[in-house]
Amino acid sequence: MPIVRLKENEPFEAALRRFKRTIEKTGLLTELRSREFYEKPTAERKRKHAAAVKRHYKRIRSQQLPPRMY
């Protein structure tokens, strides 16, 4: 669990921003969301494979030259 200590004369909002940043870096929220409901191993593999295919096509699309405009 990430710990953020409040510095002297530091506003609470700044400490909250630091806490949110540390939570985001550790990936705690994404882990919690993924563990919120049970996902069958086959469903997890299927979801990960679909994401990999989507990333692959996105990478190919970004590497292609744009069509010529006449």
From Swiss-Prot:
Keyword Ribosomal protein among UniProt keywords: yes
GO annotations of cellular component type: ribonucleoprotein complex; ribosome
GO process annotations (BP): translation
Swiss-Prot/TrEMBL keywords: Ribonucleoprotein, Ribosomal protein
Xref: Gene3D superfamilies: Ribosomal protein S8
Pfam families given in the database record: Ribosomal_S21
Gene Ontology MF, one: structural constituent of ribosome
InterPro entries: Ribosomal_bS21 (IPR001911), Ribosomal_bS21_CS (IPR018278), Ribosomal_bS21_sf (IPR038380)
HAMAP family associated with the record: Ribosomal_bS21
Family: Belongs to the bacterial ribosomal protein bS21 family.
Name of the protein: Small ribosomal subunit protein bS21
Source organism (scientific name): Bordetella avium (strain 197N)
